[in-house]
């Protein structure tokens, strides 16, 4: 597997990642088998979201004992700081982890991004679908 450093994060991620949305089509046991296969193939980047139904919870179960082998990314569509903090807490619980390396936010103002808590439970914050110039 080839790896790249992700921007200025310092994170070494596999060129091939896994998008967690298809997990809703399989069960928790098959999710565990899939994570072991991905790890053995050298894939270390997993993207998920609470809106992907069972994805985070199945991944949380599946990564037990092998969490350190993966870089997790999740996201939120929340529009205010309190909702975002709640989303992060729920994702941490679902994923059975104490941190998420990459957290993607939608619809946030530039001023609010500084308040979310980058560096504590969230390693790095990425912005998408945002019009920062108007905020």
Regions found by a protein language model. Give the residues of each.
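Alpha-helix-loop-beta-strand connector modules within alpha/beta enzyme cores
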Residues: 56-75, 122-135
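Conserved beta-strand positions
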Residues: 18, 48, 74, 102-105
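N-terminal binding-site loop/beta-alpha segment at the start of enzyme catalytic domains
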Residues: 1-70
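Active-site beta-alpha loop architecture of Rossmann-like, nucleotide-cofactor-dependent enzymes
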Residues: 52, 79, 106
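Glycine/proline-rich, positively charged
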Residues: 36, 82-135
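Active-site mouth loops of central-metabolism enzymes
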Residues: 19-29, 73-85, 109-114
